[in-house]
Amino acid sequence: MAPQDTSPLSTQIEASGRPALPDVSLRITEALAFDDVLVAPAYSQVLPGSVDTRTRLTRTISLNIPLVSSAMDTVTEGGMAIAMAQHGGMGVIHKNLEIDEQAAQVRRVKKFESGMVVNPLTIHPDQTLADARALMNTFHISGIPVVERETGRLVGILTNRDVRFATDPALKVYELMTRENLITVTAEVHPEEARRLLHRHRIEKLLVVDDAYRCVGLITVKDMDKAQAHPLANKDELGRLRVAAATGVGEDGHARARALIAAGVDVIVVDTAHGHSAGVLAAVERIKTLSNAVQVIAGNVATPEGAAALIAAGADAIKIGIGPGSICTTRVVAGVGVPQFSAVLETAAVCRAHDVPAIADGGIRTSGDIVKAIGAGADCVMVGSLLAGTDEAPGEVFLYQGRSYKSYRGMGSIGAMARGSADRYFQQEIKDTLKLVPEGIEGRVAYKGPVSAVLHQMQVNARFRRITGAGLRESHVHDVAITREAPNYRQEG
């Protein structure tokens, strides 16, 4: 007897070359969206204020809150990434930017806050006031350690107070710098001791020196104040905020990944609409060879098989979700996808078996959906529309019918693909925007104010019970007002 063909329907071909007829014995399984389930209340001794929301983002990087902002051009750039990291999450800077510009956004986040500025910018005594001001203006700093040109030994510090009233750009640094009574510490100084020294001497910067009196770091009042204001901030081992950035497949994606790693990014996200594909698997494998320190998140997938393939390629976390987003039309336009609750439930099980974190990406409309996603097996969730109307999201606030809004669009919308995200949907070779096949729409969301107020509303855990059928609604555009229709999608009613 010939062995039974167990290959997927899409690969079963008759001898004539025509696709085989589907096996009528195949069972169509039920799949659930977030709206199909509710948390079943149960006895608890844990008060909401004592809930621990720490979780993993990747194999080696953790989060203090289970929230990640999505790599969308109306959601995450430097400002959102800073705010997310300060509150304990992480932001993924979108790739609809030139490579240099995206790398600059990463550097902005990494330099925004430091426990100690390692290897700070320095200047030599024989340089000029013009040189000093150029450094201060370019890097937005108010003080520069002065070191000997040959030995690197610390000889002074030049601050705004030293140069404020100087008018001759040819003046030498040694004529202006503060050289007496320099307050220095070693790299092992305790934060409380550093704060005490700053207060006692009424200064804003502590110079960190090594045994040879070379300047190896800088501790500033601003950074200490930021650390005190945001105790849950997600930081690396040097006290800098953590940040992720998106890239694509192919040579452009690889070049982008190299630039992002050079800029100091913590996590690279290989961001595509269909992660279970040869190009994505190859991209993950190549990026993993670039750095041992940088973690790689890959996606999106909605099946256990897709997750297993990405894990085998070396992915450090898996992004789950095809089509659940409020501005995504993939399921309707392409007829592809899995309702998000079931996708997370089934796919996260594979991730858990390999000790790889799972990220639920899309379909999160309320804090209750976060609870359901985490209970289904996700380690954290990626959100877009919930953050799109905040101050930190890119774009301006505009008035419509007397109310304030901000723009929000899917990365599969015509506008986003024309700007640079077409490769996410494997349409990068199409130059005529009229020939692009969009899988998202452009819309508006209500203005929400600072992101801190939104983040405050989202953190919990639990179990579920099915209640209703809501998969179709999740597959369609929801929770935004469409301002520009895609040519292949129209919502009736």
State each model region's role.
Residues 1-43, 123-124, 185-186, 196, ...:
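Alpha/beta catalytic cores of nucleotide-metabolism and tRNA/nucleoside-modifying enzymes
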Residues 49, 98-107, 167-170, 214-234, ...:
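Active-site-adjacent beta->alpha loops and helix N-cap segments on the catalytic face
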Residues 51-63, 70-72, 101-141, 146-149, ...:
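Bateman/CBS regulatory modules and CBS-like beta-alpha motifs in cytosolic regions of diverse proteins
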Residues 62-69, 115-120, 180, 236-246, ...:
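Short beta-strand/loop segments at the ligand-binding rim of alpha/beta enzyme cores
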Residues 79-82, 255-263, 296, 302-320, ...:
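Catalytic cores of alpha/beta
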Residues 86-101, 265-277, 316-334, 364-398:
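Glycine-rich phosphate-binding active-site loops on the catalytic face of alpha/beta enzymes
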Residues 92-96, 122-123, 143-145, 184-186, ...:
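Catalytic beta/alpha-barrel core
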Residues 95-110, 146, 151-167, 198, ...:
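Terminal amphipathic helices with adjacent charged low-complexity linkers/tails
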